Swiss-Prot record:
It is found in: Cytoplasm. It comes from Colwellia psychrerythraea (strain 34H / ATCC BAA-681) (Vibrio psychroerythus). The active site is at 122 (nucleophile), 147. The keyword NADP does not apply. The lineage of its organism: Bacteria, Pseudomonadati, Pseudomonadota, Gammaproteobacteria, Alteromonadales. This is ATP-dependent Clp protease proteolytic subunit. One of its GO terms (biological process) is protein quality control for misfolded or incompletely synthesized proteins. It is an enzyme of class 3 (hydrolase). InterPro entries: ClpP (IPR001907), ClpP/crotonase-like_dom_sf (IPR029045), ClpP/TepA (IPR023562), ClpP_His_AS (IPR033135), ClpP_Ser_AS (IPR018215). GO terms for molecular function: ATP-dependent peptidase activity; ATPase binding; serine-type endopeptidase activity. Its EC number is 3.4.21.92. The gene is clpP.
Length: 220
């Protein structure tokens, strides 16, 4: 439950994270590169950002969303015609934070290829489905979970109706977008998200949340 935010998350797996994208900064390894000017060190995620790889890991919340958005905008400014690869391992989180990421994905020029590693639950699953069609992937043992937004409110009785209308509006909006991304009917999406709905990688492909399963790199 919460007081002021509508969320969409798998609550049993939410944990607090200290870094921008949900990765513990104290555990981040460093990479040392040799350049013409000598050695240069990067944390591993900054180095992967040079390869246009972004990690969305952990709970979706405002601080993480702002940094994901900043990385998306930076990579667009660097090369607007090159794809960006968004790796997702998330139990979900804030709907507003997730929609900020989603809107930026649609706003910028580069195609966004989404890849589920581990899990993409709730808002994580929504962002997974929002990648460029034909470029949305799951790894073989990844799990995807879709459901309706979770909400709660504490306050005056007269405000309850206002908040109830808002959460129903958001539920309808998310279902319409999910139907658009998956090719399912709105009625089916509404029915399938009424309760927690877990899907294997194969089921996620069949449902239309992703386009294919990545077993290994093509050049391996």
């Amino acid at each position: 439950m919460f007081n002021s935010q509508i969320t969409s998350q798998r609550s049993s797996q939410v944990s607090s994270q200290s870094s921008a994208t949900g990765i513990e900064s104290a555990l981040v390894p460093m990479v040392v590169e040799q350049t013409a000017k000598g050695e240069r060190s990067y944390d591993i995620y900054s180095r992967l950002l040079k390869e246009r790889v972004i990690f969305l890991c952990g709970q979706v919340e405002d601080h993480m969303a702002n940094l994901i958005i900043a990385q998306l905008l930076f990579l667009e400014s660097e090369s607007p015609d090159k794809d960006i690869y968004l790796y997702i391992n998330s139990p979900g989180g804030s709907v507003t934070a997730g929609m900020a990421i989603y809107d930026t994905m649609k706003f910028i020029k580069p195609n966004i290829s989404t890849v589920c590693i581990g899990q993409a639950a709730s808002m994580g699953a929504f962002l997974l489905s929002g990648g460029e069609k034909g470029k949305r992937y799951c790894l073989p043992n990844a799990r995807v979970m879709i459901h309706q937004p979770l909400g709660g409110f504490q306050g005056q009785a007269s405000d309850f109706e206002i908040h109830a209308k808002e959460i129903l509006f958001i539920k309808d909006k998310l279902n319409k977008l999910m139907a658009e991304h998956t090719g399912q009917t709105l009625d089916k999406v509404s029915q399938d998200t009424d309760r927690d709905n877990f899907l294997s990688a194969e089921a996620a492909v069949e449902y239309g949340l992703v386009d294919s399963i990545l077993e290994q790199r093509n050049d391996k």
